[in-house]
């Protein structure tokens, strides 16, 4: 809950005896301290043990948006500003999209949701035009034609949708937004 802050607080206050672990995205410690005015824990009281998985997000659009590539999206959105969904202000999907908009000069209206699931639901129903969402959640919808996959946020293509290029391959140089799911322990373990 609270973008990982509740779990992090629990681990920060736990005895460093090896019995308390935190599985959390790296965003809990890279983004949250910048977004939340008050954290009920000190990030330095928790240390990373290992990265469990590294992943990218996929830029996807509703099929009603007449785009098949990042170049199409750039041209279409400049002519007719679109809306994009995210899992909330400061969420990885929000920041990755803002990074894209900054790199390309594309104007879009942000529609923040209370988590990525309602954002994906409204994207699938066509209430918003596009979003950056976790690949394994949207890949089946891309394969079924319910969403159009435009680009991966990271440096590598996904094995789930190898036909979807990276953002760099799609013409956005130096773009890389990769995330990790981490295992953390209280300092002193």
What are these regions (language model features)?
Residues 27-29, 55-56, 65-66, 90-93, ...:
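Solvent-exposed loop/turn segments at secondary-structure junctions
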Residues 119-122, 159-163:
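Short, charged, surface-exposed secondary-structure boundary motifs
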Residues 47, 73, 146-158, 176:
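Conserved helix-loop-beta element of the AMP-binding
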């Amino acid at each position: 809950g609270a973008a990982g802050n509740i779990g992090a607080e629990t681990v920060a206050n736990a005895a460093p005896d090896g019995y308390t672990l935190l599985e959390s995205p790296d965003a809990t410690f890279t983004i949250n301290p910048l977004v939340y005015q008050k954290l009920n824990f000190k990030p330095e009281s928790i240390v990373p043990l290992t990265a469990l998985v590294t992943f990218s997000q996929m830029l996807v659009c509703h099929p009603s948006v007449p785009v098949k590539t990042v170049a199409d999206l750039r041209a279409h959105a400049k002519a007719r500003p679109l809306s994009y969904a995210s899992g909330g202000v400061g969420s990885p999907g929000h920041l990755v999209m803002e990074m894209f908009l900054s790199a390309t000069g594309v104007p879009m209206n942000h529609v923040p949701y209370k988590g990525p699931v309602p954002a994906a639901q409204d994207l699938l129903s066509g209430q918003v035009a596009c979003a950056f969402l976790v690949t394994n959640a949207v890949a089946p919808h891309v394969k079924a034609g319910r969403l159009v996959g435009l680009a991966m946020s990271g440096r590598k293509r996904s094995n789930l949708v190898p036909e979807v290029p990276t953002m760099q391959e799609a013409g956005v140089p130096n773009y890389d937004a990769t995330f990790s799911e981490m295992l953390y322990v209280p300092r002193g373990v």
